[in-house]
Amino acid sequence: MILKSFLLGNLLSLCMKIINSVVVVGLYYGFLTTFSIGPSYLFLLRARVMEEGTEKEVSATTGFITGQLMMFISIYYAPLHLALGRPHTITVLVLPYLLFHFFWHNHKYFLNINYGSTIRNSIRNLNIQCVFLNNLIFPLFNHFILPSSTLARLINIYMFQCNNKMLFVTSSFVGWLIGHILFMKWVELVLIWIRQNHFFRSNALFIRSNVLIVPKKNLVPELRNSMARIFSILLFITCIYYLGRMPSTLVTKKMKETSKMKQMGQSEEETDVEIETTSETKETKEEQEGSTEEDPSPSLYSEEKEDPDKIDETEEIRVNGNEKSKDEFHFRFKKTCYKYKNSPVFQNFYLDGNQENSKLEILKYEKKNLFWFQKPLVTLLFDYKRWNRPLRYIKNNQLENAVRNEMSQYFFYTCQSDGKQRISFTYPPSLSTFWEMIQRKMSLYTTEKLSPEELYNHWVYTNEQKRNNVSKEFINRIEALDKGSLTLDVLEKRTRLCNDKTEQQCLPKVYDPFLNGPYRGTIKKVSSSSIMNDYLITSIENSIEKLWINKIHGILPTDYREFEQKEKIDTFDGKSLSTDIFHFLTPISKFAGESTTSLNWKGLPLLAEQERNYSKDQAKYLKFLFAAVTTDPNNQIIRNKSIVINEICKKVPRWSYKLIDDLEQQEGEYEEESAEDHQIRSRKAKRVVIFTDNEPDTNTHTNTNNTSDRDEVEEVALIRYSQQPDFRRDIIKGSMRAQRRKIVIWELFQANVHSPLFLDKIDKTFFFSFDISEMTKFIFRNCMGKNTKLKTSDPEEKEKKEKKEENERIAVAETWDSILFAQPIRGSMLVTQSILRKYIVLPLLIIAKNTARILLFQFPEWFEDWEEWNREIHVKCTYNGVPLSETEFPRNWLKDGIQIKILFPLCLKPWHRFKLRSHHRGPMKKKGKKYNFCFLTVWGMETELPFGSPRNQPSFFEPILKELEKKIRKVKNQFFRILRVVKERTKWFLTVLKEKKRWVIEIILFIKRIMKELAKINPILLFGLKEVYESSENKNRKNSQNSITIISNQIIHESPIRIRSTDWTNYYYSLTEKKMKNLADRTSTIRNQIERITKDKKKIFLTPEINISPKKMSCGDKRSESLKSFWEIVKKRSIRLIRKWHFFLKFVIEKIYLLCIINIPRINAQLFLESTKKILDKYIYNYNDETNQEEIDEINQKKIHFISTIKKSLFHISNNNSQIFCDLSSLSQAYVFYKLSQTKVINKYHLRSVLEYHERSLFLKDRIKDYFRTQGIFHFESRHKKLRNSGMNDWKNWLKGHYQYQYDLSQTRWARLVPQKWQNRVNQRRTTQNKDSKKLGSYEKDQLIHYQKQNDYAVELLSNKKEKLKKHYGYDLLSHKYINYENKKDLYIYRSPLQVNEGREITYNYTTHKLESFCVLGGIPIRDYLGEDYIIETDKNPDRKYFDWGILHFCLRKEVDIDTWTNMDTEASINKKTKTGTNYSQIVEKINKKDLFMIHEEINPSNQKKKPFDWMGMNEEILNRTISNLELWFVPEFLLLYDTYKMKPWGIPIKLLLVNLNGNENVSENKNINRKQKKNLPLSSNKNKKKSLELENRNQEEKESSSQGDLGSNAQNQGNLGPNAQNQGNLGSVLPNQQKNLEEDYAGSDIKKVRKKKQFKSKAEVELDLLLKKYLLFQLRWNGSLNQRILNNIKIYCFLLRLINPKEITISSIQKGEMSLGIMLIKRDLTFTELIKRGIFIIEPVRLSIKWDGQFIMYQTIGISLVHKSKHQTNQRYREKRCIDKNHFEGFIARHENMLGNGDENHYDLLVPENISSPRRRRELRILTCFHFLNGNVLDRNPVFCNGNNVKNCGQFLNEDKHLDRDTNKLINMKLKFFLWPNYRLEDLACMNRYWFDTNNGSRFSMSRIHMYPRLKIS
């Protein structure tokens, strides 16, 4: 068995190896190639089909195989690939060949004149060669002119993967050969079969009919003769088909390039030709690696140099080396401004070009170009920069030209990483070309390869040097601190580059080389080295990073930031330049991997006296250096003229064309290029102007330079898209349409294109739909017959019907739109119909009606009719129904079309009613009432919608007919009433008759009885009477329906005598006999019955054994009786129960409820006892310890602690029961560190210095250890146990000191957090529940007292505090491993099961393994409630969605309107809930930074209290909620709505998102905007601070521009929502910001403005623009209900804007529901808040791509940004310097006695060494020490603290009298382990090597952030 499985496994592995081998894969791909050859098979088949002999077949096959072999070789062999792939080569091949082919097949017509034998013979001899050539050339065409790209791509992919490439190519060729042979054999068989079959058929036909003989004989030769023609036609068709996919190289559409600088045009063209012709080898490589096989574009590098107008144009530093002295250089910069087009500098530069002055002069060089002829030819035949592939043109209006995306994202090249050669797949291509150029220049010197070991050692050595430099600088700073210099002076400053020395204006952040390094946008060249040194104050060790040295670093980043250069030429001193050559060339040698051994770097002239000796060498080296960077191949000429330094940077290949579509052309957006034709085929659309602003501008905000623009008319236009299928899809003219995937369209209107690959994913496709329900309905109808219909009250049916009507409508509209001259005809007909209707038809009808009324003696209704006629308004609308006005026709209406909408259409009635409607019937009638507007059709009919079917008009005569019907009905009623009376009378008469008849019958019966009696006495006497009886009986039988027998009631029946007997005696005797017999029978039966009854009676009374006494009952009777009684009881009871069931249930439920309520306290009794005990302990302790402090609100405190203890213990219980075990490594640092920050705070200062450094733990006094133990800092069992972890606890303590004043809010701000209880609870959230702790309540007490002590001036510190928290919070999230790295028990954290989010601010509770250490209550800091002030991480992580339960708890705890505690900057007191203007600019900024969820929320502005948006019932009061967990019932705060959250975990209560959107409620609506502006200002923009904040504002401005969010779906193209109001510190209101937003480019929404320079708009336009923007977001989805609503609003609103008195129409449209008041803005004062409230700005939960700033990522991942000096100056007056007596730490000042409301100084209590260095230097040191770890021991990783003396210098005040017997050596060896220098940090590596990670956005860092810090093992 084992052997079998072993064999089986081996066999499987063998099979897998065979399948995956190169040969098999090559065979497979080759076999596939057989089927992808396409039209090249045509010639091969032709040779066989036409039967031209075996020679031709063989030559065709040979040529075909040779061509295919060349193709395969070209895949592997680059020069052949290049030769075949060049467009010019193919063109040269194609043209003569096609000419020859044409000439060859038509030689009869050309050679008619001299049809000599010589020509014919020669041509015949050429036959075979021609066939060979055909078959050889066509496979070569196949990949380049007639591409089938999929297979080529597959082959390329596998070629890249496999190692043995040649083997793969060979095997694929063999596979192709096999497939080809099989294919040819199959073709032969088919041909043979066809021939045989054909002749067989024709013979059969000959026999059947003689008629067919003649044509059949001629058919076969005819076919054979025309075969050549058939093949030519087929070939032509396939070529046309394939050429449709790829435009012909000849018929290229030369596009107009963007306006080049006229002066530069010629020289640039020359260089273009040069490079293109001479750099073949480089192109070969690049074409292989960088572009696909069929890509005809030349190399990237030749493109880069080509267009001077590109954005990424690099600096040219042109040095005139001949005229001037050798050490003076001129620098020239090009500048292309894409942002500041309107600035005068740009305009001058743009227009004047390079003619500005002598400084900007181009040092031109003349050069004879051998290839002068090629440029026009090349551009004529093939323009390689045109869109010859199916590229979408991605517009980006910030950039001039679109980026070409033919360049692969990946570029493979070897580079050094960690000192070793590695292949990098995102290597910058420009760097590789740079290295190739250097290698070319290196041939001047000798070069030698270094071994990998040497390379690595060199790398290690350089890293050591760098690390030593940086650490030395760091140590110097620490020593300076030690000597007592001020902290701010020691901190490394971030050097800023100033523009102006006097005004101290710094460059913006983006352009500052010091702040951004390689990311800088501007390089400011300084005139000389002395000025340079003045400007650039850097540290001594910092000299590596001189300003211009950063040039080489421009190589490194791969992000596509566009560079801007200032045009300024300055001179450098050669000395300063030469000193830095070493640093400049170091990276070159590093990238090169080879060192230039003959270059003597030390020989560079560093001193002035050495200059002459080395001047020649210097010139040579400089020439080498600068010429190495030159791009010109003919370097000799350039060297003689000038030396050129080119800035090297990552280049992006761009198209040289800026394309526009027809819409942009219509808009005239590009005024300077308005004559240019559009090149993009966009969706068929028309521009419809809906609003023209003709009013005089009464705007005070417009600038003076805009007055000249006032004469232009401003328009607002909608784009009306045709609802036809869009087959253009923004294809560029001349691009390959057919190669576009996903181009299949099968719906009439399709918003998204669907690929046929995913047909199965689409619900119902056009041809694959098989609807079973439809089939069943169809069958049903057929089965049941035509008359019976299935009743379908199905909403789907209704929907289908509506959809069908809609489609018909669209079809009609498109038909009108597509027919030539249809629109003018239709428009004129509509206008005619409108005039006819209004002024001719309706007045005539009114006159006719009223005259008829007069004739019919009725009152005429002239007044009412004419009033209705006046009310009818004919509004001219655009083609898609946007109303304009009565008189204003839409622009170009004859061309674009028109609609005429009739408002209140006159419907002529025969009379007017003046009755008042009753109230109960009114609404019902209104429901059925139709809209009182319609559209006019061409035939004068009315229709509900444009192009809809005409609606049924109410008939004029219908009411008349109704009245007639009523009259007739009345007459009928009267007639029927008479009939009813008659009927009733007849009925009564009949009943009387019946009564009479009954009486008669009774009388007769009575007479009969008398007769019988008489007959008994004497029958003979009565014989005569009998006859009388009989006769009367016959009469009665006639009258009555049933015969009545006479003696029927008697016992003895007597039948009447029918036969008349003559012998009366016989009759008599027979009668008497019968009577006697009957009597006898009767008596006998009676007797029998009597006997039976008597027997029964005897039986009952004569049975003594059964029933002894008649009074007693037997057992059986008893049982039956009891059963009976039981059932009766049950019956009664059940009836009673049914009657009382409701009360019974109620009683049971109440009983259960009471039991629960009674039992819950019993369950939790012990808990409560514990808590009360703890509370008592706390208060006793607090009273003893803090007697001198003020008393606090005792009740509140009790309540708080009571709740907290319940919560704590409950969570202990739940944690113990359900522990989720997890290692700390799975937690984020944010979580752990946040928890640390919430731990119990040390209240005494005297511990701070004790814990400052590691060694002092030896000498701690016992009293201090006891204090530690009670404080819970160390949880050792005995106080003499070794104090191990103080190095880590150092950080704990620092954190505690840092976070203690997290809640130090000013009194005013604290008052805003309205409920007092809530304040207390927030304080209480910081408490911990340690079992050993006796001092638990003191912290809150301190805090509350402190709040009461604080002064109001602390408001000034808010901005400072905000910055501080932001700075420190970012970095303080970094360590949990270090804090717990020694204590194994602390490594595991047990979380409660309610932890849901693992995000930024973690609010769930956790306990560590040892509860003695610290158990922190979960909560959220006040930061979350104070909006922007303390929100730190939210700005950095827009991708995550958090849900904060704590916020909900506060909502639910007490019914307080959320506004009262979420108002951000409102000046409010607790008692007065007045709300004034909120800080709009901050919410704008917040929305700008983090794309918040926006909610479609309509809030009607009213003074009533608004309830928060109820997301799934989440904000309900807690009392209405079902109690799901009875254990937590007493603390409603705990009732987490967990189940709801599980259903939708991304939901966020909406009020929390729109934090400060609820201002202005009690403020009167019509206040002036200027008054609101003052309220809208942030605190920091006061006038006295304005100057100091300019710097920060500028930074912020730049940062925000890089991380812009947007509204709706246009993720890239919309601008900021106006955060500039805050940044620039201006006093503008929100409206100018909106204006700014609206004026930014609406590239996605196609709303264009004719006047773009206008700075401010009227309110109406702002509203209109916002509406339009919203409308356009949904325009593609025509069936959206939201879209319809918005569309209606737009139409009505645009109409209302034009009307002078819109009141009546407004009211009617609101009544009809056309216009929703929630959306329309009718108020005057519009602020951003109101726009959001009304739903005009809709923020949608769309994840948006944000362009990350490099610094922003660093800030996100690492950084405490440094303190600005200016801010320190502003706040210095509040800061007091403390005198700390280091020797007597017991006498330290108590914390609160000298506070003065300043929380900042605590951040400097324990100075973090990390803060000394700048983030950049910090990162550098950290990474270098990381590299150092690879060699040495992990413990020695921080050279700064290796020296014990340095540490000792920081202050030697240890108690050296105790515990000296400890192992001091061990302590010294352990070193100080700050968490600042961890082993490695993925984030740092990612930031350094982003081009290795290939990540340009920060989202992927969140993954690395989780597992960032490894555990350090301590030996």
Curated annotation (Swiss-Prot):
Biased composition (Acidic residues): 267-277, 304-315
Membrane topology: Multi-pass membrane protein
Pfam families: Ycf1 (PF05758)
Location(s) in or outside the cell: Plastid, Chloroplast inner membrane
Record-level GO BP terms: protein transport
Polar residues: compositionally biased ranges: 1602-1631
Transmembrane segments: 18-38, 64-84, 90-110, 126-146, 174-194, 230-250
Keywords: Chloroplast, Membrane, Plastid, Plastid inner membrane, Protein transport, Transmembrane, Transmembrane helix, Transport
A GO-annotated cellular component: chloroplast inner membrane
Annotated region (Disordered), positions in chain: 260-319, 1566-1631
Record field: compositional bias (Basic and acidic residues): 279-288, 1587-1601
Alphabetical list of InterPro entries matching this protein: TIC214 (IPR008896)
Function text: Involved in protein precursor import into chloroplasts. May be part of an intermediate translocation complex acting as a protein-conducting channel at the inner envelope.
Subunit comment: Part of the Tic complex.
Family: Belongs to the TIC214 family.
Name used for this protein in its record: Protein TIC 214
Gene assigned in the entry: TIC214
